[in-house]
Structures are given as structure tokens and as C-alpha cells.
Amino acid sequence: MGSLRVLLLGASMGAGHDAVSGELARRLRARGAATELCDVLTLLPPGTGPALRAFYRGTVRHAPALYAAIYALFLSPGDGHRPGSAPLAATARARLLRRVRAFRPDLLVPTFHLAAQITGRLRAEGVLSVPSSVFVTDFAVHRGWLHPGNDLYVCLTAQGAEAARAATGRPAAVSGPVVAPEFHRVAGPHPHAPEPGPPPVLLSTGAWGVGTRTVRTARLLAAHGCRPVLLCGRDERLRRRAARVPGAVALGWTDDMAGLMGAARLLVDNAAGQTAVQALAAGVPVLAWRPLPGHGRDGARSMAAAGLSTYAHDPDDLLAGVRRLLRPGPVRTCQVERGRAAFVADAAELLTRPPG
């Protein structure tokens, strides 16, 4: 790879996009590249990035129906003329071009949908000479990711790559998810019989501790013989509430997700995001339950449609899925094997591969 210089465009919206950017940067540096990470929210006019983050966090937490409506209007797949993020992307134009002039990259890699809109617009207008290879972090490739000005799309699944290719006319490849190597290292062969005691089941709420009826779900699982381990992110209030559930473990933000995955028997997930793909790498089955609105729900459905998770529609469905996936046998083994097989290629290699 020599002296290739790569500017990665992530976003401080939760922790997932930056985690992907960071892991891609690590892989690229290992291949001899120079990298720089940029939070795309800092390219927006002063105050806009924090306001956008606060609005998204607030609506997902307190007004999920409103966020679902916004997603349906601006981002959900489908034909027809609808408003998009072009006006917002235009406001980042000058600042991104300044970053490009300062760092002099040979390649831009957006890992957040707004960043993909910014680079796509600038490439289409001919003012950005540096190619842009987009890494799509979502299982459901929504409209926000898609712009024909970008040079390449690297996606999590073949279905995602086909959607990107059909919508943009640009090349699209499949790598599978991007996770740090420690998650693969904890994926050693699981014992045929579970350890004594209630099986530990992780409940994920992301970096912000966002979810619906999370504590109620923990009580339900505890009442049916599980040991719920609630990942409350940075929401201390949620952690305190969850800690009062008999038999449950409530954790705040942790830097040892790989260790938790190595000890878990199952992940109950609500976003089909980075925690879910970390579970795939670690050999932990994923069960989608009460996913976040908008891209969370679409992503959970797409992940399940790809055979990488189980989608529960109601409490009875949840408990039945938990029983099937905790029990040693072909159902659990098949889902674990499909999850591990999702990692089909090195995204860093695909993103930097010369055209043709």
C-alpha cells in the first residue's frame, strides 16, 4: 500500500460509526497507509453538529414515532421525489475541502450516511478530485447513503450491495461487518452444554442507553430463568433502574465488550448496529426485540432476512426465541455459523483496491 493517505469520515452519533472508522484506520495503518479521522459533524456550521446529535438522541428516546416519520420522509428506501439531506450536506462543503487540502488524501472513506452525501455531491460537481469509497455500516441501505457521485460502496451483505448498485449505478462489494480482532478471538468453540446457573443474556441499548421497555424485558427474562446483563451505555439513570431488577446485572459504559461477549450466551438487540455485529464475530446468537424506529427497525429486519439474527414480534415470540437460541443444538449452531460466515472479506482491502 505504500504511502497511501486515507481520510475517514465518521460521526459522533453514538459510538458505532466512530468504532468502524477507528478499526478501518487500524487496518489501513497496518497495511502501510497514513490515516486521519474526521467527525463529519464538525464540518457543519458551528453548533449544527451538536444540535443534530441532540435532536436525534432526543427524538429516538422520547418521541420514537416522530423519528420514524422523519426517517420515512427523508431516508427510507423507495421511489418518488422526497426531501433529502442535500441542503445539510451543502453546508459542509467548504470545511471538507479545507480538510482535504490540509491532509492531501488519496482516498476518502465515509462511514456515516451524511458524509457519503457530502462526498458524493462534491465528486459529482467535479470539485473533489479524490475518490470516495463508502463503507455502509447499516444492514438496510437507506437513501441517505446513496449518491451516484461516490466511486464505490462496500456493504455488509450481498443484499445491501445489490441495493447500492441498483440505486447509484456504482460498483458495490461485500465485506461483511468491521469489528476489532478481539471479538473474533473470543469466539472459540462454545461448550455443548451450558455452564451451571442462569444463562447470561446481554441486552443492548447502545452508547446512549436508548430502548423501550428495557427494564421490563429484563424482568421477563429473569422470570424465565435467564440472567439479564443490561448494557446501559452512558445512561446512569437507566443503570440504576436496571440494577433493581432481581437477578439482573446492570452495567454502564464499558471498554471490554469483547470480554462480555465471550461470557454471554445470547444478545437481545434493538438496533442491528455495532453491538450486534460484534456478537456475530464472537459467536453469540442475536435476537432482535423492540428495535429502535426507522433505520433500527429496517436494519433489524434486513439482518434477520439475511439469516444473521432472529426477529421477535411479541413477548411470546421473544421467550420462544430465547429458549431456542440458548439450547445447544442445530438452531443455535446454525445461527452462530451464519454469523461467523458473514465476515467474507477485509473491508480495508476492498475500499483501497484500484478500480477494475
Residue ranges and their predicted role:
Residues E23-R99:
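Conserved N-terminal ligand/cofactor-binding loop architecture of enzyme catalytic domains
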Residues L73-A164:
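Active-site and donor-binding regions of nucleotide-sugar-utilizing enzymes
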Residues G149-A207, C232-R237:
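A nucleotide-sugar donor-handling region in carbohydrate enzymes
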Residues P189, P194-A264:
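Donor-nucleotide binding loops and adjacent catalytic segments primarily
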Residues M257-D298:
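A donor-sugar binding/catalytic signature common to diverse glycosyltransferases
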Residues P315, G321-G339:
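Conserved donor-nucleotide binding/catalytic region of nucleotide-linked donor-dependent transferases
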Residues E337-G356:
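C-terminal alpha-helical cap of glycosyltransferases
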